[in-house]
């Protein structure tokens, strides 16, 4: 894609190449970045790991390059009840936690009902 050829970019739960985003965005264009907060799937992580690590929900903001700025941010939070074993298996399959945790811990999650908190941060970042 050509420099400054995009009015909108989106990064959803994925690593972001900030320099490439800046290169692609047209002046006044925006980047929608969606990522987990420290609360996201906390209940699942407690079942999978001996120690659940905290992290800073705003750490990525320090990576915003010159020529771009955070224009708006919101967090969406809700509880999700997973009573069905297939739903719990699907959740594990779509998160990195399902790959990192032991087979024993994954099986224990699949075998028992689980309520999880979904917590997603939405950032709107604009190109100057």
Identify what each model region corresponds to.
Residues 1-8:
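A short acidic, Gly/Pro-enriched loop at the edge of an enzyme's catalytic core
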Residues 10-14, 33-34:
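Short His-Asn-centered micro-motif
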Residues 13-25:
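A short, conserved alpha-helix within the catalytic core of class I
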Residues 15-18, 37-41:
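Short, catalytically relevant binding-site loops at active-site mouths
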Residues 28-40:
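Conserved beta-strand signature within the Rossmann-like core of class I S-adenosyl-L-methionine
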Residues 45-70, 75-128:
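Conserved Class I S-adenosyl-L-methionine
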């Amino acid at each position: 894609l050509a420099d400054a050829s995009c009015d909108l970019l989106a990064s959803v739960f994925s690593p972001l190449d900030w320099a490439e985003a800046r290169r692609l965005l047209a002046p006044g264009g925006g980047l929608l970045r969606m990522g987990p907060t420290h609360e996201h799937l906390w209940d699942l992580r407690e079942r999978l790991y001996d120690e659940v690590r905290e992290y800073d929900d705003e750490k990525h903001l320090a990576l915003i390059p010159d020529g771009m700025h955070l224009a708006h941010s919101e967090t969406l939070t809700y509880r999700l009840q997973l009573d069905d074993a297939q739903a719990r298996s699907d959740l594990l399959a779509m998160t990195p936690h399902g790959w990192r945790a032991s087979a024993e811990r994954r099986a224990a999650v699949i075998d028992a009902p689980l309520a999880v908190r979904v917590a997603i941060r939405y950032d709107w970042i604009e190109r100057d």
